[in-house]
Structure formats: structure tokens, C-alpha cells
């Protein structure tokens, strides 16, 4: 499985209730798509953008999940994890 960052541009004036409803739809859709794993997301404080981390066999299944959940899927970028633990034993 590959890992992806998804950038979702959200409409202005989105409420917390709107965000909660979108998250519930996403969870329901992903339950029916076993090849898609939602790792987590970060919501911009102005509620205008979501940055989501997914594992999937390819970007097309991520876009399909977004369509089914009726949420935006503006940019899908394949990434590789880089974290502090990966470098804990290295010499600086």
C-alpha cells in the first residue's frame, strides 16, 4: 500500500456540525472500501482546508471514496513517512 496526503479545499462558513457530518460520511464510505485506510487528518483552524493521510493502492480509489462521501479531493500526493524515530540512531 502507498501512503498519500490529500488536500481538501472546503467552502467558506463551514460549521463544526458540517465537519462532523463529513467525517461520519467518510468513515461509512471507507468501511465499504477495504483497500482504503484513513490514517488521520488535520483541519485548518479557519475550517477552509483539510489535510488527510491515507493508505491505498492508488489515488483513484481515494478519489472514489471522496466522491461517495461527497467531500472534496483537490490534491492527492503520494508520500513516504519521515519522522524523528527514523533518525534517532543516526549521528548528527
Task: For every predicted segment, state its role.
Residues 1-32, 44, 81-92:
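Short S/T/G/P-rich N-terminal loop/turn motif that feeds into the first structured element of a domain
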Amino acid at each position: 500500500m502507498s501512503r498519500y496526503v490529500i488536500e481538501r479545499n472546503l467552502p467558506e462558513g463551514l460549521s463544526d456540525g458540517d465537519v462532523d457530518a463529513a467525517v461520519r460520511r467518510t468513515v461509512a464510505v471507507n468501511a465499504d472500501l477495504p483497500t482504503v485506510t484513513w490514517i488521520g487528518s488535520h483541519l485548518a483552524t479557519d475550517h477552509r482546508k483539510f489535510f488527510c493521510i491515507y493508505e491505498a493502492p492508488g489515488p483513484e480509489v481515494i478519489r472514489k471514496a471522496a466522491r461517495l462521501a461527497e467531500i472534496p479531493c483537490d490534491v492527492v500526493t503520494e508520500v513516504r513517512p519521515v519522522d524523528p524515530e527514523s533518525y534517532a540512531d543516526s549521528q548528527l
